[in-house]
């Protein structure tokens, strides 16, 4: 039995290194060289094909504009303050209860201050009333960076923070700021006049993408009270001269147009579900994405 074990051990050692044939793991040095050379060439070719494929693909992609622009989803609609669970709950007589909401709005509006828009090489005035989309040439580097339209805080009225640093929360009249998310090259198409007839209070403007905030349910509509809108030209929506957006490379300082909404007499001590919705021919809605073209927010003003 000992001899069999010794013989087995000898065979194992001989397989690793055969001194008679000068073989390591059953192969000579020349054999190992050939097989290693084969795999180096083989994987080198695979790497070359992969790199070449990537390079060809990159030649078809523009860093300035999506290749398949028609497949980009419509922009989402979001509100500030940006909150967890889309709930705003506070007591007007308790500053701590609404402090986080106010700070969120203040931080967001920093870039909209006049002091941040003084450079005439970057910013330009695009008018105090809504107008048609402002084309700024092709999506290329030939003209360098493009100018962007200024947006004045004073257009946000009671929700500008210029006269009320609490944005209405101290008075129990909360403000929210609404923006349409950036989509490169997107030009909003306002709805046709006749399509707005079914929405009370909405007025047609060919140069405004309208937005309306209403109670989500029938019981909410009775408790939402008066809703006031503040935007450029006192229009309840987004003026078209701020579109299209040319991207971070061509418009690094771009400012989205804003719409401020103030709820002036919400029913107290009641959670009210509010839906804000943008209307347009190229604005879509999705059950899978609750921010695509609209959003819901719950507001409760406690006594």
Curated annotation (Swiss-Prot):
Outline the segment boundaries, as ranges, of region: immunoglobulin-like.
Answer: 191-303
Membrane topology according to the record: Single-pass type II membrane protein
PROSITE patterns per record: ATPASE_NA_K_BETA_1 (PS00390), ATPASE_NA_K_BETA_2 (PS00391)
- Positions of modified residues (Phosphoserine): 11
- State the compartments where it is located: Cell membrane; Apical cell membrane; Cell membrane, Sarcolemma
Gene Ontology cellular component annotations, sorted alphabetically: apical plasma membrane; sarcolemma; sodium:potassium-exchanging ATPase complex
Name under which the protein is recorded: Sodium/potassium-transporting ATPase subunit beta-1
Q: Which organism is it from?
A: Macaca fascicularis
Taxonomy, top ranks, is: Eukaryota, Metazoa, Chordata, Craniata, Vertebrata
